[in-house]
Amino acid sequence: MSFDVYVMRVFGKSRGSWEAGMGVSAGLEVAAGSVASALAAQEGGAMRVELCHGLEGGGLTPSYGMLAVVRERLHIPLYVLIRPRGGDFVFSEEEMEVMCGDVECCVRLGCDGVVLGALDPAGEVDMGMMRVLIAAAGSLGVTFHRAIDVSADPGRTLEDVIALGCERVLTSGGRSSALEGAETIAALVAQAAGRVVVMPGAGVSAGNVLELRVRTGAHEFHASARSVVAARRLGAHPYIHDLGGDYDCTDADKVRQLVRLLSQGAS
């Protein structure tokens, strides 16, 4: 279905009329879990890369070596996920020290921004810890990540994120996918009123990005755009549990498709 037909079906108006109300072009950030994924995102036309490790578990801070190589080879903005472990987003003082060290590495390597978030045991934004991390980032841009999706009150969290001076917030609307959380995302976009970018993420694909754009009013979208890469068969040795199996990598063609769809909906 073309974007024109989709907008007419949902809103009963032409694309031109709808876009006059939107007024801002749309772009794609790609979550990349390897050097190859980051380069595929760039090749496919992504506007920005969020570099991380272990996307299967929600993402962790990438290694220094990966970060250094990607920074050298990437020519589009590079943001880096700062998350020292899986699980919740309530961090200890020692974990804060680790995160500060990782942020400082990003500064030294010339990254464009960091992606982080911290909550207190009550589910509120840990303003003290966030201020320390943001201070360590200096002039780098800051995205508040999906900690908002498990916070006590997403609307209040959004106001705290704005007060901290973050550029954007990544959210699935508190659901397992952005499509399921579209109503909440739309409410956050309306509440933000241009004070911060609200960026839908989680399950964003070519099959739903137009619907998400229309339903949420968002202008930036976050996707991994991955395909399975078949493992090389090394000799006659059988696989041992999960060792040596297939793996995921960002697919430049999937990125191109998303970028093309967003461009159609913004031009």
Swiss-Prot record:
Detail the disulphide connectivity of this chain as listed in its UniProt entry: none
Query: Can you cite an annotated GO cellular component?
Result: cytoplasm
Q: Where, per UniProt, does this protein localize? A: Cytoplasm
**Which keywords, in A-to-Z order, does the entry hold?**
Cytoplasm
Keyword Cytoplasm (UniProt): yes
Instruction: Give one Pfam family.
Output: CutC
Q: Which InterPro entries match?
A: CutC-like, CutC-like_dom_sf
Q: Which domain of life is it from?
A: Bacteria
Question: Which GO molecular function entries does the Swiss-Prot or TrEMBL record give?
Answer: copper ion binding
UniProt similarity note: Belongs to the CutC family.
Q: What is this protein called?
A: PF03932 family protein CutC
Which organism encodes this protein?
Xylella fastidiosa (strain Temecula1 / ATCC 700964)
Q: Which gene encodes it?
A: cutC
